[in-house]
Amino acid sequence: LEQLAAQARWWKMLPQAGTAILVCADMTKGEKVKDEMHLSGCNAAIQNILLAAHDMGLGAVWLGVCEGSDMEPPVRQIFHLPDHIRVVGMVAVGHPACAPQQPASGWIFPFGTKSSGK
């Protein structure tokens, strides 16, 4: 995690998070479909990881590792990834440093059900 944290200023929390999940697509597997299908599946998996972490009382954040970005080569090197593996994203998971925010039910209301005070 220390090696990853050194790669981008937005990743400095990684050592404190305790866990990082790297989400990748094997571009040789599955049907021969456009790359977007692999990305869609990985993005859905990342969203499910975020939801599961929240359900377990953990904090989680989606960290982008875009193909062609400055962060991709060091990530590929740290994890020794072959060329056919495409890095889609990373999720830092750990115990949150602060209390969760107020639930959305406290500040989101269906149209017309909360008076504007006028």
Residue ranges of each PLM-predicted region?
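Acidic, surface-exposed loops and disordered segments
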Residues: 1-118
